[in-house]
Amino acid sequence: MKSTLMTASVLILVLLSIVDYASVYAEFIDSEISLERQWINACFNVCMKISSDKKYCKYLCGKN
């Protein structure tokens, strides 16, 4: 009985650490995507001020 309880406790701790890692990783991916969007928008805005060629700026900055 005691070993079953210990095994269950260890399993719960492992599962909780996996869930915690997954949520932190998801936040990291989300913030990385947000930073990429901010960079693309900034690049596009600066390019438009310089060249005013929308098609070229979209190509240069990778904006879809």
From Swiss-Prot:
Tissues where the protein occurs: Expressed by the venom gland.
Protein known as: Potassium channel toxin kappa-KTx 3.1
Location in the cell: Secreted
Protein role: Potassium channel inhibitor (Kv).
Single GO cellular component term: extracellular region
Disulfides per UniProt: 43-61, 47-57
Record's signal peptide: 1-26
